[in-house]
Design a protein with these regions (language model features):
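C-terminal regulatory/oligomerization modules of transcriptional regulators
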Residues: 1-6, 119, 123-140
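N-terminal leader segment of winged-helix/HTH proteins
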Residues: 1-32, 136
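Membrane-interacting alpha-helical segments
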Residues: 7, 63-64, 93-95
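Short, locally clustered residues in the helix-turn-helix/winged-helix DNA-binding domain
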Residues: 15, 43-47, 107, 134
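Alpha-helical linker/hinge and terminal dimerization helices associated
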Residues: 17, 21-24, 60, 102, ...
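N-terminal helix-turn-helix DNA-binding core of bacterial DNA-binding proteins
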Residues: 19, 23-66
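DNA-binding alpha-helical recognition surfaces that contact promoter or target DNA
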Residues: 69
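Charged, amphipathic alpha-helical coiled-coil/dimerization segments
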Residues: 72-131
């Protein structure tokens, strides 16, 4: 665990908190050989059934170039495949049967981290945190 930082800067505090929370998920998912980012990509694509790289990037909120780097590793693991369209612009991604099997194993693990965070915060604070995070996403 990191030493908590106390700063008046919202951005710094959010980054530190996000890093700590990401570490919790990454440590739990490491047993399955994936990171939280990879899990997020796989589960979002699975929920979409099929998507282009651009559609998936928009859904997850990642820069397309960042997503492409992550996809290369996930595709090499056999969890996502590229389904070619008529031309390269029509290529779509989809989760493979191995990827769906991985999700069956990892969703309960992901949920256990969710539960741990909610328990640590208390249900009222957990709900408040989600409201605040949603509002922060709407800001521009």
């Amino acid at each position: 665990m990191r030493n908590p930082v106390n700063s008046p800067c919202y951005c710094l505090m959010l980054r530190r908190a996000a890093s700590s929370v990401t570490d919790m998920y990454d440590k739990t998912l490491a047993e399955y050989g994936i990171t939280l980012n990879q899990f997020s990509i796989i589960i979002n694509l699975n929920n979409m059934s099929m998507a282009t790289t651009t559609e998936l990037a928009q859904q997850i909120g990642l820069e397309r170039s960042t997503l492409v780097r992550n996809l290369k590793a996930i595709m090499a693991m056999g969890y996502i495949e590229n389904v070619s369209g008529e031309n390269e612009r029509n290529n779509h991604l989809k989760v493979t049967s191995s990827g769906r099997h991985l999700l069956k194993l990892t969703i309960p693990v992901w949920q256990s981290v969710q539960d741990k965070i909610a328990e640590s915060l208390g249900s009222e604070n957990a709900a408040l945190l989600m409201d605040i995070l949603y509002k922060l996403q709407e800001m521009e």
